[in-house]
């Protein structure tokens, strides 16, 4: 899976560099893996300036300015929270592209309605924010890797379609 992460990161780098885009990330369940995959590319400072790892609800509210009431009402792992993570980090950092992830990597923390492996990814630009729901299988690390891969793929797709 590391090879796929590296391939998608390089593709994101090339896509952003070609279009002169600055990307920022807001991560929860990946714990910085997404940002790490981007900065592993030489020259990444040309396209990447910042990242937030907001693992707790308090930090999502404080750092990303997501109303705590919204998080409590919908849960941190929800489409609306992922959407707000992408939207708010995009605006706060004055970036061209944002990638946000929130999910349940396990092995605990899941429920019947929100099982381990549930992840929401949101990718934002000035014009639109796309959200996508995923269900991944595997251990904690595998879920985090799959989330990183799919977040990068979605970001690449959004860039290439615009």
Question: Regions from the language model: what does each represent?
Answer:
Residues 1-162:
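Short alpha-helical segments enriched in small residues
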């Amino acid at each position: 899976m590391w090879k796929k992460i590296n391939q998608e990161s390089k593709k994101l780098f090339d896509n952003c560099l070609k279009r002169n885009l600055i990307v920022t990330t807001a991560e929860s369940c990946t714990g910085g893996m997404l940002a790490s995959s981007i900065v592993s590319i030489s020259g990444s400072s040309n396209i990447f300036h910042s990242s937030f790892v907001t693992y707790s609800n308090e930090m999502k509210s404080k750092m990303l300015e997501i109303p705590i009431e919204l998080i409590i009402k919908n849960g941190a792992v929800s489409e609306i929270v992922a959407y707000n993570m992408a939207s708010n980090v995009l605006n706060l950092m004055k970036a061209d592209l944002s990638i946000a992830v929130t999910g349940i990597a396990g092995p605990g923390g899941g429920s019947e309605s929100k099982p381990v492996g549930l992840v929401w990814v949101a990718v934002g630009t000035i014009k639109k924010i796309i959200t996508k729901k995923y269900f991944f299988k595997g251990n904690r690390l595998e879920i985090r890797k799959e989330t990183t891969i799919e977040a990068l793929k979605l970001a690449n797709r959004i860039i290439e379609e615009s």
